Amino acid sequence: MGRKSVRAKEKKQKRLEERAAMAAVCAKVQAANQLGDPLGAFPVFKKFDRNGLNLSIECCKVSDLDQKTIDWAFELTKTNMQLLYEQSEWGWKEREKREELTDERAWYLIARDELAALVAFVHFRFDVECGDEVLYCYEVQLETRVRRKGVGKFLVQILQLMANSTQMKKVVLTVFKHNHGAYQFFRDALQFEIDETSPSVSGCCSDDCTYEILSKRTKFGDTPHSHTGHCAGCCH
């Protein structure tokens, strides 16, 4: 009985510690989501003035975007990504993509040129993935005329900056393997690594899975998390 009692107490203590750890993770995510402007402390990053471009960049929640901007973001995503989705096991589903872009948890980086024309956006969220507090990048979409001028790299670097300032452990994103340009961009130019939750590492999907999950750790995520059980979020 004595041994069973000790084991029971140890299990209870472990559960309490796990709950406390998850509560701390959720608190960080909630604090990040309550910010008015995560980019506000870094005004120098609100301008991109190089390679013939003069862009202004703002960070806001989806609730602060007008319908015209939301429609533009959807159409740009469709133009850039529909074929890639159709070549994957996911397929292209317009209703689901629009719902994803307009989810109440969505944050945006919006880039405009000197005439206030919309030229690029990033859709991201502060969230919990597999027990870790993360900044999850859903979309990085650019109009053709501003590509290959450093805009995409600059926007992702902003994500890394905000992830550090909000004490997230890493920036995470999903990329199609057959989207060779994007895959090389994140792996080579930005030094993202294949995440431990990616199908090719976790073994959760077959070998012909068409996507990888990539990540880049912040200064708060130096030690990889030891996951148990299924991946799930909180704070919703």
From Swiss-Prot:
Q: Give the lipid-moiety residues, type N-myristoyl glycine.
A: G2
Q: Write out the annotated subcellular location.
A: Cytoplasm; Nucleus
Residues binding acetyl-CoA: V140, Q141, L142, R148, K149, G150, V151, G152, K153, N179
Q: Which InterPro entries match?
A: Acyl_CoA_acyltransferase (IPR016181), GNAT_dom (IPR000182), NAA40 (IPR039949)
| Highest taxon listed in the record's lineage | Eukaryota
Q: Which residue intervals define the domain N-acetyltransferase in the entry? A: 63-217
One Pfam family for this entry, by name? Acetyltransf_1
Q: Which reaction does it catalyse?
A: N-terminal L-seryl-[histone H4] + acetyl-CoA = N-terminal N(alpha)-acetyl-L-seryl-[histone H4] + CoA + H(+); N-terminal L-seryl-[histone H2A] + acetyl-CoA = N-terminal N(alpha)-acetyl-L-seryl-[histone H2A] + CoA + H(+)
Q: Which GO terms describe its cellular component?
A: cytoplasm; nucleus
Keyword field contains Ribonucleoprotein: no
The site annotation (Essential for catalytic activity) covers E139
Q: What is its EC number?
A: 2.3.1.257
The terms under GO molecular function for this entry are: histone H2A acetyltransferase activity; histone H4 acetyltransferase activity; protein N-terminal-serine acetyltransferase activity
Asked if the keyword Oxidoreductase belongs to this entry, the reply reads: no
Q: Where are the transmembrane segments?
A: none
Q: Which residues bind substrate?
A: Y85, D127, V128, E129, Y138, T174, Y211
Say what the protein does. N-alpha-acetyltransferase that specifically mediates the acetylation of the N-terminal residues of histones H4 and H2A. In contrast to other N-alpha-acetyltransferase, has a very specific selectivity for histones H4 and H2A N-terminus and specifically recognizes the 'Ser-Gly-Arg-Gly sequence'.
UniProt-recorded name of the protein: N-alpha-acetyltransferase 40
